[in-house]
Design a protein with these regions (language model features):
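Short, ordered loop/turn segments at secondary-structure junctions
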Residues: 11, 69, 111-115, 220-221
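Structured adenosyl-cofactor binding patch, chiefly the S-adenosyl-L-methionine
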Residues: 202-243
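Generic structural signal for residues in well-ordered beta-strands
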Residues: 40, 64, 147-151, 215
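N-terminal positively charged helical leader segments and presequences
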Residues: 1-71
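Active-site/ligand-binding-proximal alpha/beta "capping" segment
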Residues: 163-205, 213-216
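RNA substrate-binding interface of SAM-dependent RNA methyltransferases
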Residues: 73-170
Length: 243
Protein backbone atom coordinates (compact mmCIF):
# COMPACT_ATOMS: atom_id res chain seq x y z
CA UNK A 1 0.00 0.00 0.00
CA UNK A 2 1.31 3.43 -0.93
CA UNK A 3 2.13 5.56 2.11
CA UNK A 4 0.09 8.80 2.08
CA UNK A 5 2.08 12.01 1.58
CA UNK A 6 1.17 15.34 3.18
CA UNK A 7 2.64 18.80 2.92
CA UNK A 8 3.78 20.38 6.20
CA UNK A 9 4.43 24.15 6.02
CA UNK A 10 7.07 24.43 8.76
CA UNK A 11 10.51 23.02 9.59
CA UNK A 12 10.70 19.34 10.55
CA UNK A 13 13.28 17.64 12.78
CA UNK A 14 13.90 14.02 13.69
CA UNK A 15 12.11 12.95 16.84
CA UNK A 16 9.72 15.89 16.76
CA UNK A 17 6.01 15.46 17.43
CA UNK A 18 3.89 17.66 15.20
CA UNK A 19 0.19 18.10 14.49
CA UNK A 20 -0.80 17.67 10.86
CA UNK A 21 -2.39 20.67 9.15
CA UNK A 22 -6.18 20.68 9.41
CA UNK A 23 -6.85 19.69 5.79
CA UNK A 24 -4.29 16.88 5.91
CA UNK A 25 -5.72 15.58 9.18
CA UNK A 26 -9.26 15.62 7.80
CA UNK A 27 -8.16 13.72 4.69
CA UNK A 28 -6.24 11.16 6.74
CA UNK A 29 -9.13 10.45 9.11
CA UNK A 30 -12.26 10.95 7.02
CA UNK A 31 -11.08 9.85 3.59
CA UNK A 32 -8.22 7.41 4.17
CA UNK A 33 -9.57 6.09 7.50
CA UNK A 34 -6.10 6.06 9.03
CA UNK A 35 -5.48 5.11 12.63
CA UNK A 36 -2.83 5.27 15.34
CA UNK A 37 0.38 3.55 14.31
CA UNK A 38 -0.14 4.13 10.60
CA UNK A 39 2.76 5.51 8.57
CA UNK A 40 2.70 8.81 6.69
CA UNK A 41 5.28 10.73 4.68
CA UNK A 42 5.72 14.49 5.12
CA UNK A 43 7.54 17.10 3.03
CA UNK A 44 8.02 20.81 3.55
CA UNK A 45 9.83 22.03 0.45
CA UNK A 46 13.42 21.36 1.56
CA UNK A 47 13.93 18.44 -0.88
CA UNK A 48 13.65 15.84 1.88
CA UNK A 49 11.03 13.22 2.62
CA UNK A 50 10.18 12.68 6.30
CA UNK A 51 8.84 9.33 7.46
CA UNK A 52 6.41 9.66 10.36
CA UNK A 53 3.94 7.59 12.34
CA UNK A 54 0.59 8.56 13.83
CA UNK A 55 0.81 8.74 17.62
CA UNK A 56 -2.71 9.81 18.46
CA UNK A 57 -5.93 11.01 16.90
CA UNK A 58 -8.20 13.43 18.74
CA UNK A 59 -11.26 14.36 16.67
CA UNK A 60 -9.72 16.25 13.73
CA UNK A 61 -6.29 16.61 15.37
CA UNK A 62 -3.57 14.14 14.40
CA UNK A 63 -0.15 14.09 16.10
CA UNK A 64 2.68 12.28 14.33
CA UNK A 65 6.25 11.38 15.30
CA UNK A 66 9.04 12.17 12.80
CA UNK A 67 11.10 8.97 12.61
CA UNK A 68 13.51 9.44 9.69
CA UNK A 69 14.56 11.79 6.93
CA UNK A 70 15.98 11.14 3.47
CA UNK A 71 17.21 13.58 0.83
CA UNK A 72 14.97 13.02 -2.18
CA UNK A 73 14.74 15.44 -5.09
CA UNK A 74 12.39 14.89 -8.02
CA UNK A 75 13.19 18.28 -9.55
CA UNK A 76 13.94 18.50 -13.25
CA UNK A 77 17.36 19.55 -14.46
CA UNK A 78 15.47 22.05 -16.63
CA UNK A 79 14.06 25.02 -14.69
CA UNK A 80 10.87 26.25 -16.37
CA UNK A 81 8.76 29.26 -15.44
CA UNK A 82 5.26 28.94 -16.90
CA UNK A 83 3.79 32.34 -17.71
CA UNK A 84 0.13 31.41 -18.10
CA UNK A 85 -2.64 33.71 -19.27
CA UNK A 86 -5.44 33.16 -16.76
CA UNK A 87 -8.02 30.76 -18.15
CA UNK A 88 -11.43 30.00 -16.74
CA UNK A 89 -12.19 27.80 -13.73
CA UNK A 90 -11.27 24.17 -14.11
CA UNK A 91 -9.01 24.80 -17.11
CA UNK A 92 -6.61 26.85 -15.02
CA UNK A 93 -6.69 24.31 -12.18
CA UNK A 94 -6.00 21.49 -14.63
CA UNK A 95 -3.11 23.39 -16.21
CA UNK A 96 -1.49 24.06 -12.84
CA UNK A 97 -1.95 20.51 -11.58
CA UNK A 98 -0.46 18.88 -14.65
CA UNK A 99 2.30 21.48 -14.97
CA UNK A 100 3.48 20.44 -11.51
CA UNK A 101 3.49 16.79 -12.57
CA UNK A 102 5.53 17.80 -15.63
CA UNK A 103 8.19 19.46 -13.50
CA UNK A 104 7.51 23.19 -13.81
CA UNK A 105 9.58 25.26 -11.36
CA UNK A 106 7.14 28.16 -10.89
CA UNK A 107 3.95 29.64 -12.34
CA UNK A 108 3.26 33.28 -13.17
CA UNK A 109 -0.49 33.92 -13.73
CA UNK A 110 -1.08 36.75 -16.20
CA UNK A 111 -4.26 38.84 -16.38
CA UNK A 112 -4.30 38.94 -20.18
CA UNK A 113 -6.52 41.07 -22.39
CA UNK A 114 -8.51 38.02 -23.47
CA UNK A 115 -8.72 36.38 -20.04
CA UNK A 116 -12.38 35.62 -19.38
CA UNK A 117 -11.79 35.64 -15.63
CA UNK A 118 -11.03 39.10 -14.23
CA UNK A 119 -9.48 39.08 -10.77
CA UNK A 120 -9.05 41.93 -8.31
CA UNK A 121 -8.93 42.56 -4.57
CA UNK A 122 -10.13 39.84 -2.23
CA UNK A 123 -11.27 37.61 -5.08
CA UNK A 124 -7.77 37.66 -6.54
CA UNK A 125 -6.20 36.76 -3.20
CA UNK A 126 -8.61 33.86 -2.68
CA UNK A 127 -7.96 32.55 -6.19
CA UNK A 128 -4.21 32.72 -5.70
CA UNK A 129 -4.48 30.74 -2.46
CA UNK A 130 -6.69 28.22 -4.24
CA UNK A 131 -4.10 27.83 -7.00
CA UNK A 132 -1.30 27.35 -4.49
CA UNK A 133 -3.39 24.64 -2.81
CA UNK A 134 -3.86 22.95 -6.19
CA UNK A 135 -0.09 23.00 -6.71
CA UNK A 136 0.60 21.64 -3.22
CA UNK A 137 -1.90 18.80 -3.68
CA UNK A 138 -0.26 17.94 -7.00
CA UNK A 139 3.11 17.69 -5.22
CA UNK A 140 1.58 15.33 -2.66
CA UNK A 141 0.35 13.12 -5.47
CA UNK A 142 3.36 13.12 -7.80
CA UNK A 143 6.14 12.81 -5.24
CA UNK A 144 7.78 16.23 -5.54
CA UNK A 145 9.32 17.49 -2.31
CA UNK A 146 9.72 21.08 -3.44
CA UNK A 147 6.53 23.07 -4.01
CA UNK A 148 6.50 25.38 -7.06
CA UNK A 149 5.51 28.96 -6.26
CA UNK A 150 2.39 30.49 -7.76
CA UNK A 151 3.52 34.08 -8.17
CA UNK A 152 1.19 37.07 -7.65
CA UNK A 153 -1.22 37.79 -10.50
CA UNK A 154 0.14 40.48 -12.79
CA UNK A 155 -0.70 42.30 -15.98
CA UNK A 156 1.57 41.34 -18.85
CA UNK A 157 3.23 44.73 -19.33
CA UNK A 158 3.84 45.13 -15.61
CA UNK A 159 5.43 41.69 -15.45
CA UNK A 160 7.59 42.23 -18.53
CA UNK A 161 8.87 45.51 -17.14
CA UNK A 162 10.22 43.74 -14.06
CA UNK A 163 12.13 41.01 -15.92
CA UNK A 164 15.79 40.78 -16.86
CA UNK A 165 17.09 39.42 -20.14
CA UNK A 166 18.56 36.09 -19.07
CA UNK A 167 17.45 32.63 -20.18
CA UNK A 168 15.53 31.18 -23.10
CA UNK A 169 12.10 32.77 -23.66
CA UNK A 170 9.43 30.93 -25.61
CA UNK A 171 6.02 32.15 -26.77
CA UNK A 172 3.50 29.65 -28.12
CA UNK A 173 1.79 30.94 -31.27
CA UNK A 174 -0.29 28.59 -33.49
CA UNK A 175 0.94 30.08 -36.78
CA UNK A 176 4.59 30.66 -35.85
CA UNK A 177 7.14 29.61 -38.46
CA UNK A 178 9.55 27.93 -36.04
CA UNK A 179 8.83 24.66 -34.28
CA UNK A 180 9.82 24.01 -30.70
CA UNK A 181 12.32 21.30 -31.59
CA UNK A 182 14.19 23.72 -33.87
CA UNK A 183 15.30 25.84 -30.91
CA UNK A 184 18.84 25.47 -29.61
CA UNK A 185 19.53 23.71 -26.33
CA UNK A 186 18.82 26.35 -23.66
CA UNK A 187 21.55 27.52 -21.32
CA UNK A 188 19.98 28.13 -17.93
CA UNK A 189 16.31 28.62 -17.16
CA UNK A 190 13.44 28.67 -19.65
CA UNK A 191 10.37 30.92 -19.59
CA UNK A 192 7.30 29.62 -21.43
CA UNK A 193 4.46 32.04 -22.22
CA UNK A 194 1.01 30.62 -23.03
CA UNK A 195 -2.07 32.74 -23.66
CA UNK A 196 -5.57 32.22 -22.23
CA UNK A 197 -8.57 31.12 -24.30
CA UNK A 198 -8.16 32.94 -27.61
CA UNK A 199 -4.44 33.45 -27.02
CA UNK A 200 -2.53 36.64 -26.34
CA UNK A 201 -3.70 39.70 -28.27
CA UNK A 202 -1.60 41.10 -31.14
CA UNK A 203 -0.46 43.89 -28.82
CA UNK A 204 0.62 41.40 -26.15
CA UNK A 205 2.43 39.21 -28.68
CA UNK A 206 4.32 42.23 -29.99
CA UNK A 207 5.34 43.15 -26.45
CA UNK A 208 6.54 39.62 -25.70
CA UNK A 209 8.62 39.53 -28.87
CA UNK A 210 10.07 42.95 -28.02
CA UNK A 211 11.22 41.56 -24.67
CA UNK A 212 13.11 38.70 -26.26
CA UNK A 213 10.55 35.92 -26.60
CA UNK A 214 10.80 33.60 -29.60
CA UNK A 215 7.48 32.51 -31.11
CA UNK A 216 7.15 28.79 -31.80
CA UNK A 217 4.35 26.41 -32.74
CA UNK A 218 3.44 22.90 -31.68
CA UNK A 219 2.47 21.09 -34.86
CA UNK A 220 -0.16 22.11 -37.44
CA UNK A 221 -3.19 21.93 -35.16
CA UNK A 222 -4.67 24.65 -32.93
CA UNK A 223 -4.51 23.59 -29.28
CA UNK A 224 -6.61 24.68 -26.32
CA UNK A 225 -4.71 26.75 -23.79
CA UNK A 226 -4.48 23.91 -21.27
CA UNK A 227 -3.35 21.47 -23.97
CA UNK A 228 -0.75 23.86 -25.36
CA UNK A 229 0.95 24.52 -22.03
CA UNK A 230 1.18 20.85 -21.10
CA UNK A 231 2.25 19.68 -24.56
CA UNK A 232 5.03 22.27 -24.55
CA UNK A 233 6.20 21.34 -21.05
CA UNK A 234 6.30 17.64 -21.90
CA UNK A 235 8.15 18.36 -25.15
CA UNK A 236 10.74 20.53 -23.40
CA UNK A 237 11.36 17.85 -20.80
CA UNK A 238 11.85 15.31 -23.59
CA UNK A 239 14.16 17.60 -25.59
CA UNK A 240 16.19 19.23 -22.81
CA UNK A 241 15.07 17.97 -19.40
CA UNK A 242 14.78 14.71 -17.47
CA UNK A 243 12.61 12.59 -19.76
Amino acid sequence: MRIPRFYFPDALTLGARVALPKDAAHHAVRVLRMGEGDAVSLFNGDNHAYSARILRIEKQNIVVLIESRVALSCESTLSILLVQGISSGERMDYTLQKAVELGVAAIQPIQAERSVVKLAGERREKRMQHWQNVVTAACEQCGRNKVPEVKPVSGLMDWLGEQGSEGQRILLVPDAEMRLRELAQPVGAVTLAVGPEGGFSDKEQTALLHYGFTSVRLGPRVLRTETAALAALASMQALWGDY
